Amino acid sequence: MSGGGGGGGSAPSRFADYFVICGLDTETGLEPDELSALCQYIQASKARDGASPFISSTTEGENFEQTPLRRTFKSKVLARYPENVEWNPFDQDAVGMLCMPKGLAFKTQADPREPQFHAFIITREDGSRTFGFALTFYEEVTSKQICSAMQTLYHMHNAEYDVLHAPPADDRDQSSMEDGEDTPVTKLQRFNSYDISRDTLYVSKCICLITPMSFMKACRSVLEQLHQAVTSPQPPPLPLESYIYNVLYEVPLPPPGRSLKFSGVYGPIICQRPSTNELPLFDFPVKEVFELLGVENVFQLFTCALLEFQILLYSQHYQRLMTVAETITALMFPFQWQHVYVPILPASLLHFLDAPVPYLMGLHSNGLDDRSKLELPQEANLCFVDIDNHFIELPEDLPQFPNKLEFVQEVSEILMAFGIPPEGNLHCSESASKLKRLRASELVSDKRNGNIAGSPLHSYELLKENETIARLQALVKRTGVSLEKLEVREDPSSNKDLKVQCDEEELRIYQLNIQIREVFANRFTQMFADYEVFVIQPSQDKESWFTNREQMQNFDKASFLSDQPEPYLPFLSRFLETQMFASFIDNKIMCHDDDDKDPVLRVFDSRVDKIRLLNVRTPTLRTSMYQKCTTVDEAEKAIELRLAKIDHTAIHPHLLDMKIGQGKYEPGFFPKLQSDVLSTGPASNKWTKRNAPAQWRRKDRQKQHTEHLRLDNDQREKYIQEARTMGSTIRQPKLSNLSPSVIAQTNWKFVEGLLKECRNKTKRMLVEKMGREAVELGHGEVNITGVEENTLIASLCDLLERIWSHGLQVKQGKSALWSHLLHYQDNRQRKLTSGSLSTSGILLDSERRKSDASSLMPPLRISLIQDMRHIQNIGEIKTDVGKARAWVRLSMEKKLLSRHLKQLLSDHELTKKLYKRYAFLRCDDEKEQFLYHLLSFNAVDYFCFTNVFTTILIPYHILIVPSKKLGGSMFTANPWICISGELGETQIMQIPRNVLEMTFECQNLGKLTTVQIGHDNSGLYAKWLVEYVMVRNEITGHTYKFPCGRWLGKGMDDGSLERILVGELLTSQPEVDERPCRTPPLQQSPSVIRRLVTISPNNKPKLNTGQIQESIGEAVNGIVKHFHKPEKERGSLTLLLCGECGLVSALEQAFQHGFKSPRLFKNVFIWDFLEKAQTYYETLEKNEVVPEENWHTRARNFCRFVTAINNTPRNIGKDGKFQMLVCLGARDHLLHHWIALLADCPITAHMYEDVALIKDHTLVNSLIRVLQTLQEFNITLETSLVKGIDI
């Protein structure tokens, strides 16, 4: 940008950098606003493609039918002073666009023409910000050419309108018979008319200050006094140039912790800047946000911002958009919004609502269209805030902020103390008048929350109408606190004699602001008081870490979450995944000592340190008890001291070196200023030298550049360059050079950003998931929790929604992904109906598989449409967004997400119809890479559908495989089956005779754990040899195999009529996706081999003592690991107890070792030995032969458990009874006692050989020590294992 003479000085030490005037250029005349023209072009192109514009018009084609007074015309930057300053190059496009976001506006004397003030922000590509403050007012148009042009436009418009809206002849006759009442449209036309002979035409003009810091109240006062000077009948004491020159060149920027007083046209202006150990500068009224939205809505919006949802603010007041946006981001301290931030979205950037990235933007409303007529490209993850109507729309599945009720209560108390109802007030003037009536002396600090002494506003009266506050009342009453008025004694140490130099209302705004901000800051200080403990410092040098930081894990999230109270987890697990938290931790790692620290981080860390010193919270002592803010009083006093004792008073405005006659102006018109005196500052600056301390400039300069000065030049340049690169990709839209090629380039950067995000997200999910599975296999340490995994999957769903929303032609429903799926479903149905879609290949393939083996379950077809139907049949899911997320979860669990999406996008005609050319889904290379990244999820097992939708009905298919070789077909009894899972179990279900397959429906059982199968022993041949049972979830396709290999029948095997089978999930075949679940070959199931025809223990595999010890050790180790996992990540304990390598099987091997061989073909089981031992000990007790009390207690417990198991009505057989005894012994921590008891029992000598493990005291003592490690765990048994026994 070309620049003229600099404004003097080489550092941003001045209060203001530029004074700007925008408005109508009478030399170029009336020009249609090209920004609005671009917007109309975009909307017209959407209309041609069958889409509706972003904002639906009240009448079709309104953009072309608007009266000339309602159209927008091109505004220009008419003047700026100085021309340029080196530290803040002037961005003409951005300033012009944001001063008058919709261009020029014309009005007549019949229209309201009140001046309107608004602030704005210009965010540069490197992330730095410049602040603007604009006052828009109306001036009478004196140019005859402009008035004539407007009159001509009206003639043309009326002629077009009459032609377009002329009624048919019949309608004309009908209308002539009516009373001649004007239609609403006609009334509107007349109201908006302009007649050059009788109307006065006014046009908008804007004066603006561009400043390095956001002193909003001071800048507003400067502009309003300047405007008052030109509208007042009496001229100001000095020419306007004197006041503008003074604020540009002679008013310094106050350094941290200082206050400043300078002169406006009519009165003094005061501003103060917080010190480096206070909360950062914030000069917008928090009061207005709570009045407009209410506490509940503010908290919901605050939560959405913290979780980085897309946020769209909507209001017809630019200043409201800015105030809400700035307030929400200020309340985030110490975190900072990292994404697109455009509180006032110019008309030319409406296409940016299509951005598939988190954003916080403000959209101007014309005051006529309601929410239903506002069409937005994507709404699945959108928080929509209609500020003017006190209304907010939230995304689904929004978690609650920790301790929300107590937090809301604390904020509500402060608001009530200032006369602001917590539920908000649509008529803000009422609340403002209450606040104005309060005397400053009534604002008495109570060291906690600034309650008002003797306030006439009864808290109950203020709150009784609000539902949210009603819940708070109940909470407060439970804690014993009354909601009645409290008498607050005045603090004798308060500074009641302290006289501040600003008016009372301004002081109250300062006080309310700091109280609310301190409470919010205190919440984060409490929640993250020990965050430093979990920061993972990099092992490599800073340069290497910075290069690879996106791939580095820099915060121990799992450990941090494991220490948090349970109610905090849904919010915190998602918050830890945000960019703002990642940047916060990056800052912490980059800054090793206080000198290096970012100013915001330094303030936060000092507060954390203070909390620790006060023993409020320590890293080793965590509590979920809500702790109120205690820093309000100190923060208030700091502000009051600065306002009472002004640190510096700038020099007063004075006459400049102007020619005689210059500086005159006509009242009501902002004059053309003398550029020769305003373009440069004073050469010697004698005024500044005389009045402003030189150290101000030096100190301020050092504070602003401290982080850059501490880096060497190469590092600084590198970091700045990267910041610019990131900003130019997806962080911030550039507000200039808005040509179609630039828009296309912006969209291309969005595509690249989406692909990069997809790559990083899939990698993160795989690393975390595979890390956890490695732990289950005994490698590494656990690093993920169930909540965290669920958060990552929810984040993936959000990403998919943003991808499917990018470049949409027609927005239908809140979920773009589900809308696309529905279109695909309709297309397939139509093709199937017309016969154009062949299904022969699928059917033949299925038939061929059915004929492979008779023992196969019917193949489960892989079908995108079928999975959609599963979701559509779930009544609990009501919304399109919920259905899309459920479908994604189901596809991930079935390892079909990439395949399904590839199939969805294979319909190229549909994709072209739904999406514009620049959309991500129409970029072939990026789309292929995206699908490839998703394919990597097939390497891990997710249960993200099963574990989330726990209450839905699931169809299950059962296949029972009996032994054909041993007469299974002659079975005459009536079998039954009962299936158990982690979430519940079925009732006993009768199986029709000779039926081996059946399907049933029940509530989701979760991961299946056991099957109980048995029969009633009826008929001539009531003996059944079952090889295995298979159960398949018909929605997820998960198939579980439950090996048996045992007889069910009296006189067969161990005489059992029922078995408890423990199953495991079968792994899918990786080589062919469509392959249905097959039963693995028999030789792959050792349990089936070992137990298929186990008539006597001699036939079982022989293990030596070392192998037995190893198997018991592994079984116990598996149980120990189970209890060291987070509770939600613990798998099936039943599998660890009764599974193939479980504790029961290992102890069975121990008792079988050295067991004497049976004679005369008599079957002998371990249970026979245990029953004899029971008889022996009962005999001893009857004979009162008691060696010792401890021994007596153990023997009595053993006999009681064996007797109870023998008396159970279940026919579970001798091996089943042994399994039950081991499970009960593990539950009650008695196993090691029983092992010692049985080792000393004389029965052991008769039934075991000398080499038996149980007769080797060394091995027995080793076994006892291993089993003792289970004593510290609370083992809960599945119902199926202990059914029928009450002990």
Swiss-Prot record:
**Keyword match Repeat:** yes
Question: One Pfam match, by short name?
Answer: PLAT
Q: Which GO terms describe its molecular function?
A: guanyl-nucleotide exchange factor activity; small GTPase binding
Q: For this UniProt record, give its keywords in alphabetical order, as a comma-separated list.
A: Disease variant, Epilepsy, Golgi apparatus, Guanine-nucleotide releasing factor, Membrane, Phosphoprotein, Repeat
Q: Which GO terms describe its biological process?
A: negative regulation of neuron projection development; retrograde transport, endosome to Golgi
What PROSITE patterns does the record point to?
DENN, PLAT, RUN
Annotated ranges, domain PLAT: 954-1062
Q: Give residue numbers for the modification (Phosphothreonine).
A: 1079
Q: Where is the cDENN domain?
A: 278-414
Q: Which InterPro entries match?
A: cDENN_dom (IPR001194), dDENN_dom (IPR005112), DEN5A/B (IPR047278), DENN_C (IPR043153), PLAT/LH2_dom (IPR001024), PLAT/LH2_dom_sf (IPR036392), PLAT_RAB6IP1 (IPR047277), RUN1_DENND5A (IPR047294)
Q: Any idea which residues bear Phosphoserine here? A: 193, 1085, 1087, 1096
Region called Disordered, residue ranges = 681-709
Cite the dDENN domain residue spans from the record.
416-598
- Domain uDENN as annotated: residue spans: 57-259
Report one GO cellular component: cytosol
Organism superkingdom: Eukaryota
Q: Which CDD domains match?
A: PLAT_RAB6IP1, RUN1_DENND5A, RUN2_DENND5A
Q: Residues in domain RUN? A: 787-950, 1134-1282
- Record localization: Golgi apparatus membrane
Function, in words: Guanine nucleotide exchange factor (GEF) which may activate RAB6A and RAB39A and/or RAB39B. Promotes the exchange of GDP to GTP, converting inactive GDP-bound Rab proteins into their active GTP-bound form. Involved in the negative regulation of neurite outgrowth.
How it assembles, according to the record, is:
Interacts with RAB6A bound to GTP.
Give the disease entry from the UniProt record. Developmental and epileptic encephalopathy 49: A form of epileptic encephalopathy, a heterogeneous group of severe early-onset epilepsies characterized by refractory seizures, neurodevelopmental impairment, and poor prognosis. Development is normal prior to seizure onset, after which cognitive and motor delays become apparent. DEE49 is a severe autosomal recessive form characterized by onset of seizures in the neonatal period, global developmental delay, intellectual disability, and additionally cerebral calcifications and coarse facial features.
Q: Which family does it belong to?
A: Belongs to the RAB6IP1 family.
The protein depicted here goes by the name: DENN domain-containing protein 5A
User: Which organism's genome codes for this protein?
Assistant: Homo sapiens (Human)
